[in-house]
């Protein structure tokens, strides 16, 4: 029984360490990608609990010229860019050979679409992107 409890403690300890390391890298990536997509501002992830293995994650975003806010209070385009920033932050940890994006640019205005396309072009050195879009800027 002692060996089993010891093994469980070791697994929990390693899980906490790996989850914290991954969270820190994703948070750093998210903090870099968000201003690149928004042309400024800042964003971060916050663990909502004391115990990382039981904790949730809250997304805090501050688009340029706005106050820190929860993702729920953002406009449709701001939500799309924030979510894209987070997905790409996760994607950078373990990039796949291809990525399918289905109309993620639909709620974006032209300047945001151009920044989004610029980031995708940069990331396309490692990953092939397949788009479903109606946006002419994205098609170019």
Task: Give the predicted meaning of each segment.
Residues 1-140:
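Terminal ABC-like ATPase head and other globular end-domains that cap long coiled-coil arms
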């Amino acid at each position: 029984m002692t060996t089993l409890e010891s093994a469980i403690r070791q697994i929990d300890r390693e899980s906490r360490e790996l989850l914290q390391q991954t969270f820190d890298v994703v948070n750093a990536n998210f903090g870099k990608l968000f201003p690149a997509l928004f042309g400024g501002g800042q964003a971060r992830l916050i663990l909502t609990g004391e115990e990382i293995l039981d904790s949730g994650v809250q997304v805090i975003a501050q688009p340029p010229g706005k106050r820190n806010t929860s993702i729920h209070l953002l406009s449709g385009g701001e939500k799309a860019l924030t979510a894209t920033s987070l997905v790409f932050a996760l994607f950078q940890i373990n990039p796949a050979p291809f990525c399918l994006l289905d109309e993620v640019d639909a709620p974006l205005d032209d300047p945001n679409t151009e920044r989004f396309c610029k980031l995708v072009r940069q990331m396309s050195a490692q990953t092939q992107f397949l788009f479903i879009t109606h946006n002419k800027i994205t098609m170019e």
